Amino acid sequence: MTKNTRFSPEVRQRAVRMVLESQGEYDSQWATICSIAPKIGCTPETLRVRVRQHERDTGGGDGGLTTAERQRLKELERENRELRRSNDILRQASAYFAKAEFDRLWKK
């Protein structure tokens, strides 16, 4: 059974800072992460993801989306869904009123 622990942004930043400051003491970044993760109380993989995200946010890393870009993308996708829903409602209303007008003209 896994436990979900939410860490505050300060704890996350401190953990990433500890990894970055301690890299010279270990053979690899993964070794650094594996030694620091138990001290923080998270899994090494969770800490690795945080370090990678920090690297992307500060201009390094593998070219993934920064946190701000990810947030903006999420907002744009939400807006896109709402606009599609609105267009669908307008399309259905237009069809309904066109049919009503056609029926009115036909009955004359």
From Swiss-Prot:
Pfam families hit by this protein: HTH_Tnp_1
Keyword hit for Membrane: no
GO molecular function, one term: transposase activity
Swiss-Prot/TrEMBL keywords: Transposable element
GO biological process: DNA transposition
Superkingdom to which the source organism belongs: Bacteria
Family named by the database record: Belongs to the transposase 8 family.
Name this polypeptide is given: Insertion element IS629 uncharacterized 12 kDa protein S4062
Native species: Shigella flexneri
